[in-house]
Amino acid sequence: MKRIQIISATAAALMLAPLHAQETHSGAAKPAIRQIKIISSAGARALADACSAWAEQNKQTVAIAILDWGGNLVESHAMEGAGANSIDTALLKAKSALRWRRPTSEMNKIVRTGQNLAPTFMHDFPQPGALPIMVDDQMIGAMGVSGADGEKCAQAAIDSVFKASPKPATQ
């Protein structure tokens, strides 16, 4: 019995030791836990409202899907007159922008030119209309918009709510 306890304690210590601190190339310890920013439901609602206002001002009808950093739907909204599949399209676009960490218009160009067809095989939707939501160089979610000028609508909303947070870097 004592032998099993010793083996169990040793195994636990070996498994947990890497979590305490890891060395980086510079020799500094990396923390075992990092803090992340997440979009709140109020923030997501504000994005949807700002995008809807932009669309109305530009005489457009849109549907909007906003995901948190883990891909969970935080907010969705379809303006009156939006097509029956508009929310689904906005959601697919948002998921694609989140997974690839880039605007879906960039993904569309990559697929159309044949540089990378992976997005089409991975059930992504590389059509323009979605952006990653970046705050302080950290992706906190993604916003997909179905309707004309979807990325312009999303960027206007992100700029409005997050006071012109930097656009995601293209790779």
Language-model regions, residue ranges each:
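Bacterial N-terminal signal peptides
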Residues: 8-18
